[in-house]
UniProtKB/Swiss-Prot annotation:
The protein's name in its UniProt record: Large ribosomal subunit protein uL24
Family: Belongs to the universal ribosomal protein uL24 family.
Role this protein plays: One of two assembly initiator proteins, it binds directly to the 5'-end of the 23S rRNA, where it nucleates assembly of the 50S subunit. One of the proteins that surrounds the polypeptide exit tunnel on the outside of the subunit.
Molecular-function GO term, any one: rRNA binding
Keyword terms, alphabetized: Ribonucleoprotein, Ribosomal protein, RNA-binding, rRNA-binding
Subunit structure: Part of the 50S ribosomal subunit.
Keyword field contains RNA-binding: yes
Amino acid sequence: MAAKIRRDDEVIVLTGKDKGKRGKVKNVLSSGKIIVEGINLVKKHQKPVPALNQPGGIVEKEAALQISNVALFNSATGKADRVGFRFEDGKKVRFFKSNSETIK
């Protein structure tokens, strides 16, 4: 099945503490979750690793979000938008449902 949201897409968060924030997709996980740059930041307590010369401490990093809690951001309309699929020149492409613009 083709993915509606892919790596490097710009998405907007629909629900949760980061509602309304936009970010770029860093990673799409097979469990139906995604990691977005600068969104859903959590503090992780990390032990030092002397063998790798890594200091310990509290590190802030991005946690995964459910893919259903984000939508693709349409820069033409400035809003979140739904994604559809169609065939153009024998290739399956994604498009925004509001204005039928093809997604690059």
